[in-house]
Design a protein with these regions (language model features):
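Asp-based, Mg2+/Mn2+-dependent phosphohydrolase catalytic module
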Residues: 2-32, 42-43, 47-61, 66-176
Length: 176
């Protein structure tokens, strides 16, 4: 399997990430996918998402939403969390991730990407040189093209679980 498809970490939920520890390690920018990463597909920001972004801002993180959706969808979510966003990002192309870092004032050494899809989120962030955290999708209801991709992702995750320590070593802490 290709290492660029493997995340640096694979966790149950965005909400189980230890963001306090990541800040202590020197990370300052977090780029998020929205649908099935922060809320179910198409949903507005809920209390849990709003609380998360409030906490991240209090810690000192610069946050960005990076989505392939059109602006009305991204803006609907962002109206409650008030962070920077890029819509129609063209993931997995690395240009959107690089633009996000430029807006945030961060670089590959102190930026993290959190998303729920391997072929768009993880692949693009890896190509841009950003630490990746893959999370399990929040809700099983998805569009048909994503359902088909999930079957291929299951194969990648099988190889990841079997070989990730050999293929891709644990990511080093960010420089301060």
């Amino acid at each position: 399997m290709c290492a660029f498809l493997y995340p640096d970490e694979y966790l149950d939920s965005t909400y189980s990430i230890d963001f306090d520890q990541l800040y202590k390690e020197g990370y300052r920018g977090i780029i998020f996918d929205i649908d099935n990463t922060l809320v179910p597909h198409g949903a507005p920001a809920d209390e849990r998402a709003i609380s998360l972004f409030t906490h991240l801002k209090e810690l000192g993180f610069h946050c960005m939403l990076l989505s392939n959706n059109k602006e009305p969808r991204v803006k609907m979510f962002n109206d409650a969390v008030h962070v920077n966003y890029i819509y129609k990002a063209g993931k997995p192309k690395p240009a959107g991730y690089r633009k996000a870092m430029a807006v945030l004032g961060t670089d590959t050494s102190n930026t993290i990407f959190v998303g729920d899809q391997i072929f768009t989120d993880v692949c693009g962030a890896n190509l841009a040189g950003i630490r990746t955290i893959l999370v399990k999708p929040i809700h099983p209801k998805e569009e048909i093209q994503i359902v088909l991709k999930r079957r291929l992702e299951a194969i990648v995750l099988l190889f990841y679980r079997l070989h990730c320590k050999i293929v891709k070593p644990k990511y080093q802490s960010a420089r301060k």
